[in-house]
Each structure stands twice: as structure tokens, then as C-alpha cells.
Amino acid sequence: MTKLTARQQQVFDLIRRAIERTGFPPTRAEIAAELGFSSANSAEEHLRALARKGVIELAAGASRGIRLIAGQDDLPHQFTLPHASIMQLSLPLVGRVAAGSPILAQEHISQTYMCDPSLFSSKPDYLLKVRGLSMRDAGIFDGDLLAVQKKSEAKDGQIIVARLGDDVTVKRLKRRPDGLELIAENPDYENIFVQAGSAEFALEGIAVGLIRPSEF
């Protein structure tokens, strides 16, 4: 691997840990906050230095468009942008979900996208159109397409899709002794507490990637 400065190594390791833990690389703001930089611009300077050394790739216009390219054999699966020449994976796009019906019910599927499999940290089952800004600070915005893998279990800190009664929501999972907390990544939105054993809660899946419609 190319020799990095101590600070560059910290940034590289932070990106790697974030991908291993959540399936997403961090945003510039998250790197700055974690490593004590004065601003996201400082994080951007370090990212550009890493890109010049050939250990990461940066995708223009994507807040989490960071791809590790050094030490390929031991890197975690990671987010990349789609490559137009490799469009293999067919994914249904889920729009609005009707109360009480399965998330992949035919009436919820508005269209199908062909995607590059390397876009995702692991193989997704569907795309969910994000509505609202509750996950803004995680780089997930209204209208984005969240790639979701169906799961019955999720790890602490992962971004999940959950059903709460008649609603479907995207939040970050935090386990507590008495239940679950669904964390909003936007101070304008309240977190949601779910009592242990609540029949109102059902895990629909975990986020394994993100697509901006403009990327197609």
C-alpha cells in the first residue's frame, strides 16, 4: 500500500470502519466531526490527497462517493457509483406502501431499475424511494433511492427500513436494554422508541447502498 501520513491513515481507517459497520462510507462532515477537523473542507483536502496517492476514488457530486481501492483482497464491500457499461441487477422500485400490505406487493412497485451490482455493499432486494429529510445528515435525501436487503436482524448502528404500525420509516438502529431506538439523522426530527417485543415493529431490511436518480 502507498505510504500515507499519520493523518491520511486516520482518514483511510475511518472510511474503512464506516463501510464495515454500516455499508456506507462517511460524508465529509462526518469525517471532520470524528477526527476534529475545523470543517468539511479540511476533510475534503485529505480525501483529495488520498485520491492522488491512488488509495481511494472520489465520485463527483455524491456525498458518500468514496471508494477504497488499495489492498483489494481485504477491503470490505463498499459504495460506488454505477457504471453504465455494466448494468446487470434488476431491482424493483417501491414507491408508497399501503398500510398492512407487504412492502414488495405488486401494487407498490412503480418501475424496475437495472443497476451495477458493485454499487451496493451486498446484494439488495429492492429500491425504496425516500420521502422526507429525517436522514439528511446521513446523506440520504428526499427522492433518493435506498437499496434495501431484506433481513430479519440488524446490527446496532445500521440504517434500517422498519414498519411501525401502518408506516414505513428509514432510521439508524440503536439497541437499548428496554427496546430499540430509531435514530433520525436530522435534529428537526424526533427519534422513535420501540418497546421490546412491540407487535407494532417489523424490520423490513437494511440499507446496502444509495442511488441519486440523477446518477442513472
Curated annotation (Swiss-Prot):
Reaction catalysed by this enzyme: Hydrolysis of Ala-|-Gly bond in repressor LexA
Annotated site (Cleavage): A99, G100
UniProt-recorded name of the protein: LexA repressor
GO molecular function list: DNA binding; serine-type endopeptidase activity
InterPro entries according to UniProt: LexA, LexA-like, LexA/Signal_pep-like_sf, LexA_DNA-bd_dom, LexA_repressor, Peptidase_S24_LexA, Peptidase_S24_S26A/B/C, WH-like_DNA-bd_sf
Assembly mode: Homodimer.
Domain of life: Bacteria
EC numbers, comma separated: 3.4.21.88
Function summary: Represses a number of genes involved in the response to DNA damage (SOS response), including recA and lexA. In the presence of single-stranded DNA, RecA interacts with LexA causing an autocatalytic cleavage which disrupts the DNA-binding part of LexA, leading to derepression of the SOS regulon and eventually DNA repair.
UniProt-annotated catalytic positions: S134, K171
Known DNA-binding region: 28-48
Signal peptide from the UniProt entry: none
Enzyme class of the recorded protein, top EC level: hydrolase
Organism: Paraburkholderia phymatum (strain DSM 17167 / CIP 108236 / LMG 21445 / STM815)
Pfam family, one: Peptidase_S24
Keyword Phosphoprotein: no
Name of the gene: lexA
Keywords linked to the UniProt accession: Autocatalytic cleavage, DNA damage, DNA repair, DNA replication, DNA-binding, Hydrolase, Repressor, SOS response, Transcription, Transcription regulation
Family: Belongs to the peptidase S24 family.
